[in-house]
């Protein structure tokens, strides 16, 4: 038998332990490779959105690679610790430290090459679905398949180097131990975890404080940051201290603890929660971020509609604007150069402000005749002191609400004696700002309160294709934001800011969260099967004094269920409290997408739990 064959036999003989490592590594390679295929796709070479998407995907690639580095480091170290006894015996039988180093390197490279091959093959198979989902979420044209030589080379070389250098690094953990320590293996008796009561209560208090601030409503200013800080700190101490403290309290509750199988799973769970506290903390926070992002994106998509604007492009010129004609010529030139056939309207508006508490929001005032002529909106029957309010699609007020009464200011910023009652709130007309429509007589009387302005509206087809020229015009019009006498907005720009950019963030975030989920489940698998022999011996001893196979299975099931779903439940709680602020404000459209995302993660977690439980019980019963 050659040395390489010996290494291969070791891998196949320890396939139970290596299986989760192999599958998780292959999954990391698959995600990295499919992201790389997306990143280097020929269709993404041009375009403003495509450039932003490439930057986001590049950041995601680095995050996945760094995470893969930490994941492989942890996994290899865990495997080496579980095989300390085997290494000690090999050293006693005459294998040299150099040969042992070569053996470990060969084993890791075998697993690495197999993982890379499986991940790349899986990436090819999965790529069409990935491209379809990515294009759908980002609302781009469908991406065709191609031969990704660059993505293939970067993935293969990057992960080969990753596995090689990490195998060299982890050898240090073995070389630092004596033969006696290696032979003892992992059989050392662990002391029972003793949590700090003070830190346990502190963790619970932080969570209660964060949740309480959300429940009181009206979150503003620095409060969101304080809530986030309290939640993160509270979650960490809840997993590392409070959960252990609660289990120790259950042990003191004799009527519960000494009843049937409870004594077994509670005692075992104390150690396992302590061992996995940091892992649970990371998974719960990342999952909560992914779930919350889904809800926020759903709110954006349902409340900020670029399509609601009457014009594809809007330019507002205030009085005494020296660059008005220059800007209008630039807009005409860009639209004509890029092949857009358009029409242009000019609307006289009055730029006025009204008092709302301590703020003085701006609003564009137009006459009811112009509202009917240019926006095809009927607001007939308005009295002299009445107005119809149209929020802007880019307005901060996503709920389409308005004050019952508008107390208008004059051009000096002083409160005038003119007040308008809001008769009705309708859908937005433009992206730039809110509009109020008044009858023609009232408009003539009140327009002098504000700054005279001209609103130019451009209408054309295929507005989603005008993002690049919109960005170019916006940079030209606003310049360095000094001495600006105009405003500019476009459907494409609004749509990009409120839908496509958040969608890109969610697209990347969800896949990174999936990688973390898979890795977390794999970590649990490693922990369980590393301690399998010790657990089997303990249950055999308990069976001799009356523990039935059914009770053993129930004890294992309870422990695994808590280990798999505990961080998931905490993440869902964080998400529900985070999104409660939206519910308080009246946003009810987050439930569907949020339920779909959480349900998807739950089904994945459930399937992994059932698979691990089945495999673990089979090994325990041998």
From Swiss-Prot:
It is found in: Cell membrane. It is a multi-pass membrane protein. Induction: Transcriptionally regulated by YxdJ. Induced by the antibacterial protein LL-37, probably via YxdJ. GO terms for cellular component: plasma membrane. The chain crosses the membrane at residues 20-40, 56-76, 118-138, 154-174, 195-215, 219-239, 279-299, 498-518, 558-578, 590-610. GO terms for biological process: transmembrane transport. Keywords: Cell membrane, Membrane, Transmembrane, Transmembrane helix, Transport. The keyword Transmembrane applies. The complex is composed of two ATP-binding proteins (YxdL) and two transmembrane proteins (YxdM). Belongs to the ABC-4 integral membrane protein family. Part of the ABC transporter complex YxdLM which could be involved in peptide resistance. This is ABC transporter permease protein YxdM. The lineage of its organism: Bacteria, Bacillati, Bacillota, Bacilli, Bacillales. The gene is yxdM.
């Amino acid at each position: 038998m050659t040395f390489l064959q010996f290494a291969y036999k070791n891998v196949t003989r320890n396939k139970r332990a290596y299986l989760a490592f192999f599958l998780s590594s292959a999954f990391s390679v698959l995600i990295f490779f499919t992201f790389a295929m997306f990143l280097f796709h020929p269709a993404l070479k041009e375009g403003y959105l495509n450039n932003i998407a490439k930057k986001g995907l590049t950041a995601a690639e680095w995050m996945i690679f760094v995470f893969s580095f930490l994941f492989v480091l942890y996994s290899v170290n865990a495997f080496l610790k579980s095989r300390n006894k085997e290494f000690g015996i090999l050293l006693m039988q005459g294998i040299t430290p150099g040969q042992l180093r070569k053996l470990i390197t060969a084993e890791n490279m075998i697993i690495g090459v197999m993982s890379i091959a499986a991940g790349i093959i899986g990436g090819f198979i999965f790529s069409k679905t990935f491209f379809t989902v990515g294009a759908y979420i980002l609302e781009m044209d469908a991406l065709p398949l191609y031969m990704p030589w660059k993505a293939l080379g970067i993935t293969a070389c990057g992960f080969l180097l990753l596995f090689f250098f990490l195998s060299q690094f982890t050898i240090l953990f073995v070389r630092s131990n004596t033969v006696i320590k290696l032979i003892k293996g992992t059989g050392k008796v662990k002391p029972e975890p003793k949590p700090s009561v003070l830190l346990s209560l502190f963790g619970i208090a932080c969570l209660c404080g964060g949740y309480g601030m959300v429940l009181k409503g009206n979150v503003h200013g620095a409060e969101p940051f304080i809530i986030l800080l309290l939640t993160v700190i509270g979650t960490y101490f809840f997993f590392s201290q409070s959960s252990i403290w609660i289990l120790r309290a259950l042990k003191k509750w004799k009527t519960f603890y000494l009843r049937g199988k409870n004594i077994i799973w509670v005692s075992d769970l104390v150690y396992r929660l302590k061992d996995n506290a940091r892992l649970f903390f990371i998974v719960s926070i990342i999952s909560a971020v992914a779930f919350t992002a889904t809800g926020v994106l759903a709110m954006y998509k349902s409340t900020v509609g670029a399509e609601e604007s009457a014009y594809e492009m809007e330019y507002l010129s205030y009085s005494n604007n020296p660059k008005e004609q220059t800007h209008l010529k630039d807009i005409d030139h860009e639209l004509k150069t890029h092949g857009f056939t358009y029409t242009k309207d000019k609307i006289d508006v009055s730029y006025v402000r009204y008092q709302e508490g301590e703020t003085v929001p701006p609003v564009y005032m137009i006459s009811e005749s112009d509202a009917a002529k240019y926006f095809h909106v009927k607001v007939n029957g308005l009295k002299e002191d009445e107005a119809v309010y149209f929020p802007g699609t880019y307005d901060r007020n996503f709920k389409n609400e308005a004050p019952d009464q508008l107390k208008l200011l004059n051009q000096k910023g002083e409160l005038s004696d003119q007040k308008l009652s809001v008769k009705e709130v309708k859908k937005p007309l433009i992206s730039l700002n809110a509009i109020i429509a008044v009858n023609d007589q009232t408009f003539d009387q009140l327009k002098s309160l504000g700054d005279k302005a001209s609103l130019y509206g451009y209408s054309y087809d295929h507005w989603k294709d005008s993002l690049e020229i919109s960005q170019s015009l916006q940079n030209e019009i606003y310049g360095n934001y000094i001495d600006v006498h105009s405003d500019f907005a476009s459907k494409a720009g609004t749509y990009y800011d409120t839908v496509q950019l958040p969608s890109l963030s969610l697209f990347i975030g969800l896949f990174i969260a999936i990688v973390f989920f898979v890795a977390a489940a794999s970590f649990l698998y490693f922990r369980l099967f590393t301690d399998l022999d010790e657990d089997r011996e303990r249950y055999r001893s308990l069976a001799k004094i009356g523990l039935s196979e059914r009770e053993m299975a129930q004890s294992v099931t309870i422990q695994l269920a808590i280990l798999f779903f505990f961080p998931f439940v905490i993440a869902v709680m964080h998400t529900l409290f985070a999104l409660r602020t939206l519910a308080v404000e009246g946003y009810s459209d987050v439930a569907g997408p949020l339920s779909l995302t959480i349900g998807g993660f739950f089904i994945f977690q459930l399937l992994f739990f059932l698979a691990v439980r089945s495999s673990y019980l089979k090994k325990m019963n041998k």
